[in-house]
């Protein structure tokens, strides 16, 4: 999960709309939220970020640059719908949507003590995608 990217506005807005939290609350959270990630995710929220990293990695393997992709999405009631676009745009939107919905489901696991968590404290095996 990287919040310093071109799709920051869309992903950040999605996070705010679905969770009520600032998108910055997830930047630097645990072992996976923010730039890179390794070892064992700390909790369900961190697992959402690991899954998001895996989703982006899959897009990159198909020659897409998800961190540079911009997309449109719509919020109808509480439902996110990705707009039309090329496969990279729609794929990036789908990854971001899945992460945001995961954050919403994992809201009870969120711990302030994992904000800006030192990556050097991350332990265990890195799970596969």
Task: Please tell me what each predicted stretch does.
Residues 1-129:
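Extended terminal accessory/targeting regions
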């Amino acid at each position: 999960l990287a919040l310093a990217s071109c799709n920051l506005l869309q992903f950040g807005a999605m996070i705010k709309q679905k969770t009520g939290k600032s998108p910055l609350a997830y930047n630097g959270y645990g072992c996976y939220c923010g730039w890179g990630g390794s070892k064992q995710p700390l909790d369900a929220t961190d697992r959402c970020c690991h899954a998001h990293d895996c989703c982006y990695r899959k897009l990159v393997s198909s020659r897409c640059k998800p961190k540079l992709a911009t997309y449109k999405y719509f919020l109808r009631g509480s439902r996110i719908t990705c707009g039309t676009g090329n496969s990279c745009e729609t794929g990036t939107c789908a990854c971001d949507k899945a992460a945001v919905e995961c954050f919403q489901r994992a809201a009870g696991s969120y711990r302030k003590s994992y904000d800006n968590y030192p990556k050097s404290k991350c332990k265990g095996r890195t799970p596969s995608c």
